[in-house]
């Protein structure tokens, strides 16, 4: 990333965002130093796959729906929905409920609370799904207790 920034500056086309996979489930950007580097260099982050390909929605709470990407083997493999992951999804869903949000809304809000995240890329397949996802912007404030609960759920 650092070298790409140098090249683009030389070309007078500065990079201003870094697009990375980022979600409650996938926080590699926090551990590999890229997020810190972006902050130090004034670069925003665009999060893609913010709902972990649908895992961070209510879609898989009761198993694998027949019409889902997972059932069709497209993008998301059945192996991704382990008993441990399903349990985490269910507990996260409970936290979302206490916030008056769906799991998807809370998962998006969790990203949008971060001033470094300039945008999230969502893959809504209907207008209704898009409208539901946009509700995440109505409550992006998290208490320290909520953030700690989420952290503990993910670290189990």
Label for each model-derived stretch:
Residues 1-155:
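Beta/alpha (TIM)-barrel catalytic core signal, keyed to glycine-rich beta->alpha loops juxtaposed to Asp/Glu
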């Amino acid at each position: 990333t650092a070298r790409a920034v140098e090249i683009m500056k030389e070309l007078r086309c500065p990079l201003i965002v870094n697009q990375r996979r980022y979600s409650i489930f996938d926080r590699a950007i926090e551990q590999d130093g890229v997020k810190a580097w972006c902050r130090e260099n004034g670069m925003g982050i665009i999060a893609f796959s913010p709902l972990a390909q649908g895992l961070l929605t209510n879609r898989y709470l009761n198993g694998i729906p027949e019409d889902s990407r997972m059932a069709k083997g497209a993008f998301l493999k059945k192996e991704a929905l382990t008993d441990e992951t399903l349990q985490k999804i269910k507990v996260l869903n409970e936290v979302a409920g206490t916030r008056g949000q769906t799991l998807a809304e809370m998962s998006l809000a969790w990203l949008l609370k971060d001033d470094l995240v300039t945008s999230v890329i969502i893959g809504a397949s209907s207008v209704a799904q898009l409208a539901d996802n946009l509700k995440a912007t109505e409550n992006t404030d998290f208490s320290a207790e909520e953030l700690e609960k989420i952290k503990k759920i993910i670290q189990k």
